[in-house]
Amino acid sequence: MVDYELRGGQVDCVLRRCVVADGKVWQLQMTAPLAGSDLPEDRMTPRERELCRDDMNHDFLSGVFNRRYYETEFCTKLDEWTDRHRCAALALVSIDDAAALSARENDAVMGQLVCFVANQWKKHFDQPAERVVCRLSDTLFAIGCADRTRRELEEELKAIYAGMPKECVASVGLMRRVPFTQSIGVAGTREVRCKNWDALYDLCQKRLVAAQAAGGDRVYDGE
């Protein structure tokens, strides 16, 4: 994630990234000063500003929305939906055994796999005001959807996942097929007292972990 911060009259470009190594998640931050005391957006035309913000809201690898968009743009829509008495649902999607895959495959192959998975979901969730897919971390995605209960989104995701390829053709080096599966946890606003994405996320995460513990390759559909 790239951001800009004003510190003591100096504009800094801040790059933040999470790196998984040895089973731990490390948060890296790099800062570099920019010339002048104005934020880059202040120097742009309206069109340049729009393009810049759009670029900052998308994952550089897969092209789907990123965590920044999820946290600053899409999550705020929940308040609008609940104010209008509209329900919403959230799903967390994870590639199974990602650590083992990363250990077995090189970065280029993993990048192709992530892009493949992202684009499979993007086919069905690419309406920024209502249905979106976001890449939250290396192999974790969030799918947000308005006007769906938990069960309705579960059934939709089951149907989509059932027809989704479970092999990615890796074109790095010798062309070959890389098999993979996914686990999915879903929650809806009607299930949580605090109708916000944090509460939904926590419930989704519990169900995602349960799906993985049950062997993966499934949409969690327990109680």
Regions found by a protein language model. Give the residues of each.
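Per-ARNT-Sim (PAS) sensory domains and their PAS-associated C-terminal
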Residues: 1-26
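PAS-family sensory domains and close relatives that share small-molecule sensor folds
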Residues: 15-22, 31-35, 147, 186-188
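Signal-transducing coiled-coil linker helices
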Residues: 22-60, 65-79, 129-131
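Short hydrophobic beta-strand segments that form the core of ligand-binding sensory/regulatory domains
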Residues: 25-32, 90, 140, 185
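Catalytic-core segments of nucleotide cyclases and related cyclic-nucleotide turnover enzymes
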Residues: 42-49, 150-158, 172-175, 187-220
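Conserved long alpha-helical elements within nucleotide-processing catalytic cores of c-di-GMP signaling
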Residues: 57, 66-89, 96-123, 134-138, ...
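Conserved beta-strand cores of small sensory beta-sandwich domains that regulate signal transduction
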Residues: 89-93, 134, 185-187, 220
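GGDEF/GGEEF active-site signature
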Residues: 115-189, 208
